[in-house]
């Protein structure tokens, strides 16, 4: 509860888009002064989670939150010499989707589990996942008459990754995707809508009905389930060092609690779910120097902690220098404009008003196409039908990101494009859509046209979105050492790993990865720990 009623009551009072409505799950523990000036000095909590640079229209505190990455070496050494503060079976690091799934799976397997999150609330990069969850063979697909197969899912994913993926991991991803949907639905998740994302041959991206972002919804469901099942979850708690015993087996970790200092936790097994390094400028400059000046859409806590800890104990890395740029990050911000916007009908044009790419191509190819356009940026253009159908688009409007006009000519003027060119682009696209064939760029799916006023545009440019590589794992999610041998008791899942997505990740595969391999890592970590008792 807050001073003026809880967030649900605030949201229910309005019939139009309301910022409270999108925060019913993850903002409920924080009072109104998190965003507004009221009885206490405000802080822009939104930037903790979303990591963008726009000044919020509902706050007077625009500065971004910064994560303090410093480590007190003397305090770490002292904690290492001390007795463990507690002993657990499975220690999971990172409370995004991968970590939450791992913790729940381990707990259900009978293990004593502690889940650590360095931020002040759970969610991690998963909170920013807007598109959906790719799955094959679901009742949702069957209901819509979608013909899909595991082999097609594997083929699309391997093609999207340019054949650099580990085929065994991709096979597991595809085969486990439908059961992962059921796993989430059994907890209360809504994944009833099915659309198509770039690089997919058919509609297989599952998401909540009404265009809600998939990440916050899934995190909310998983967090509630973890609490219900008694997972020991702690925020403001950062693992800083892995501990091994004399036989090179996992023995625990040193943790830095924001309010409890440095201490030791003894553990029989350990799950990395610490995301990638998209917000670590030094690591980006080292591994992918051509991206060193590029903005990132990632959560501020995506700083490569797990990769660093793994390297320090001799873990093997794979594809570590491969970084994916997302083609549509809001210009001069870090707000990701979801792939869903293109998937449901938006067209992409350059500053002259011309289409230049199949909007549903893979992210790497779309990003490369934008970087070859004048000023290395683009516009997403759509009409009121799309605006009304996708709640996230209304959210972008609330943030002041959209340009709006009653005619395409007027929109072109606002966006400094040539009016006749934009009008012709829209006219040609509408003709292609009605004919059922995009003769210009071969876009396979055109759900909506650019027909009904008012018309909208949002400026975009590529930004760092996913670090493709990370720790090398086996099909059982075991972390490998530099001699390709499993490190006893060490497991990993999600963006901290490499091999699943290859050179380029398809939209919708990240959430699938976190669920399928999150569960897998938790189950195997629990089995190892319980056997070691």
Language-model regions: role of each:
Residues 1-75:
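Short sequence/structural segments immediately N-terminal
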Residues 112, 118-232, 236-241, 346-361, ...:
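Conserved N-terminal/central alpha/beta ligand/cofactor-binding core
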Residues 210-268, 307-313:
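Helical element adjacent to the flavin cofactor pocket in flavoenzyme catalytic cores
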Residues 241, 421-504:
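A glycine-rich dinucleotide-binding beta-alpha-beta segment and adjacent secondary-structure elements
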Residues 258-261, 265-330, 517-520:
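Glycine-rich loop(s) and the adjacent beta-strand/alpha-helix scaffold that form part
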Residues 309-316, 423, 514-533:
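Internal hydrophobic alpha-helix adjacent to the cofactor/substrate pocket in enzyme cavities
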């Amino acid at each position: 509860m807050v001073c003026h009623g809880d967030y649900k009551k605030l949201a229910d009072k309005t019939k139009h888009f309301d910022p409270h409505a999108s925060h019913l799950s993850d903002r409920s523990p924080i009072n109104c002064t998190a965003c507004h000036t009221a009885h206490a000095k405000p802080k822009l909590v939104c930037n903790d989670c979303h990591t963008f640079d726009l000044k919020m229209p509902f706050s007077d505190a625009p500065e971004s939150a910064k994560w303090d990455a410093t480590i007190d070496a003397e305090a770490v050494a002292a904690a290492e010499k001390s007795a463990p503060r507690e002993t657990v079976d499975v220690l999971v690091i990172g409370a995004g989707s991968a970590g939450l799934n791992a913790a729940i799976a381990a707990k259900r397997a009978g293990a004593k589990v502690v889940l650590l999150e360095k931020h002040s609330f759970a969610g991690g990069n998963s909170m920013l996942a807007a598109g959906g969850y790719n799955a094959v063979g679901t009742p949702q697909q069957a209901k819509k008459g979608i013909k899909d197969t595991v082999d097609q899912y594997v083929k699309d994913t391997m093609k999207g990754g340019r054949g650099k993926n580990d085929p065994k991991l991709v096979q597991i991803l595809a085969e486990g995707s439908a059961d992962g949907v059921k796993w989430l639905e059994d907890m209360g998740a809504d994944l009833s809508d099915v659309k198509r994302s770039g690089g997919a041959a058919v509609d297989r991206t599952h998401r909540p009905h009404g265009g809600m972002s998939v990440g916050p919804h899934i995190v909310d469901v998983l967090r509630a389930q973890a609490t219900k099942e008694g997972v020991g979850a702690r925020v403001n708690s950062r693992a800083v060092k892995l501990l091994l015993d004399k036989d090179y087996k996992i023995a625990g970790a040193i943790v830095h609690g924001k309010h409890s200092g440095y201490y030791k936790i003894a553990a029989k097994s350990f799950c990395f779910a610490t995301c990638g390094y998209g917000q670590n400028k030094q690591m980006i400059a080292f591994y992918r120097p051509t991206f060193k000046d590029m903005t990132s859409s990632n959560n501020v806590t995506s700083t490569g902690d797990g990769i660093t800890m793994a390297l320090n104990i001799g873990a093997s890395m794979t594809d570590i220098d491969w970084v994916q740029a997302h083609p549509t990050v809001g210009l001069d911000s870090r707000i990701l404009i979801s792939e869903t916007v293109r998937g449901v009908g938006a067209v992409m044009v350059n500053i002259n008003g011309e289409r230049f790419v199949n909007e549903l191509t893979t992210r790497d190819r779309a990003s490369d196409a934008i970087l070859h356009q004048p000023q290395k940026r683009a516009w997403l253009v759509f009409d009121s039908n799309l605006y009304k159908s996708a709640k996230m688009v209304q959210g972008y409007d609330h943030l002041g990101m959209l340009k709006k006009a009653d005619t395409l000519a007027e929109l072109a003027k606002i966006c400094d494009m040539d009016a006749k060119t934009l009008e012709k682009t829209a006219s040609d696209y509408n003709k292609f859509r009605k004919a059922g064939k995009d003769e210009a760029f071969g876009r396979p799916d055109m759900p909506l046209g650019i027909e009904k006023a008012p018309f909208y545009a949002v400026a975009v440019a590529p930004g760092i979105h996913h670090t493709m590589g990370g720790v090398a794992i086996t099909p059982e999610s075991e972390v490998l050492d530099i001699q390709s041998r499993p490190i006893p008791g060490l497991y990993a899942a999600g963006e901290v790993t490499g091999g699943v997505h290859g050179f380029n990740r398809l939209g919708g595969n990240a959430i699938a990865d976190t669920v399928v391999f999150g569960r897998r890592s938790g189950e195997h970590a629990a089995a190892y720990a319980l056997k070691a008792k």
